[in-house]
Amino acid sequence: KIAILGNLLPLWDDPLWLAEQIAMMDMISGGRIVSGWVRGGGRESVSHNSNPTINWDRYQEAHDFVVKAWTTPGPFRWEGKYLHYRYVNPWALPYQKPHPPIWIPGAASRATVKWASEHRYPYVMIGGDLALTRISFDYYKEVASENGYQSSTQHVGKLVKVHVEDTDEKGDQVGRKYLSGVSNPFLDGNEGIVNLSIQNLPGLSPRGGNARMPVAASLAAGRGGVGRQSYEAQVQHYSIISAGPKKVIAGMRHVLEYLRPGSMFFWDGDGSMTHDDQMRSLRLMGQEVLPAIREVGKELGLVGPYEVPGEVTGTYLPK
């Protein structure tokens, strides 16, 4: 599969173009595309001169429009609050029917978890430690129950920074490169720490005690968060797993046992890692780690969306 996690829906002035691009990739690849939708953070809003106060509303309308463009024979007209098309008749339609699978990455926003669960879209936690991720998954399950279905492993996924080396010592040495790298205008120094005043623009996210998961809210209040923790702390919390194959497999087993996600995503080759660092890890990942993790998943009874009939594309269609 080719998972795009994900496109920044609220920032597209012409989401019809986006719908056709993804449809074309789905045709060319023979139905391999997984389409992820994200809202983006404050940095993206600043870069694209986008109003953060309407980000969430634009996200939802753009999503409904793209799904309709994929599933409704044209021509049709769309007159929404933010999007206006007199004539919609896509020349490219997805290979997969009714549309490519939609997965929703998120980082502790209650609104995003709730919305994903209401639409029965798999939710992929891309930030936060294991405790915060479990709280998010439990909330997804709670919302699913309120909407008439029981969520399971196929509805949740987790992104973890994973790097593999021949030895644990080498893994520890290279893994520290996650916390360094080239600077950019939106980071404090060159240690990859997001400037909170840019990331959390006024109006971008709902305010109040229920806007974020409890652990995330407490971290934000203390200017904490995984990105501001030391390397040792992130390793302790399983936000980074960087070691030899056996230790990486053991760490991933703990993650799988604790969270029970049906899908896992590995974040490698970041920070100041070199091309050689990435290629060594990629080789060991494919030869030793992934086969072992798949067996652990089978042992724990973890299934992904593609292993459950009817769960691939979800059940949502726009009205």
Label the predicted regions.
Residues K1-I4, R58, R283-G297:
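Alpha-helix-loop-beta-strand connector modules within alpha/beta enzyme cores
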Residues I2-G6, I33-W37, I102-P105, Y123-I126, ...:
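Hydrophobic faces of well-ordered beta-strands that scaffold small-molecule active sites
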Residues L5-L16, P98-A108, V162-E165, V235-K246:
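Active-site mouth loops of central-metabolism enzymes
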Residues L9-W78, P122-M125, D129-A131, D138, ...:
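Flexible, glycine-rich active-site loops centered on histidine and acidic residues
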Residues P10-W12, R43-E44, T112, A131-T133, ...:
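Flexible loop/turn segments at secondary-structure boundaries
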Residues L18-Q21, G106-K114, K247-V255:
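Short, acidic/polar
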Residues M25, V66, I102, A116, ...:
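Conserved, mostly hydrophobic/aromatic
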Residues T53-L93, A131-P261, R294-K319:
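An alpha-helical appendage that flanks or caps ligand/catalytic pockets
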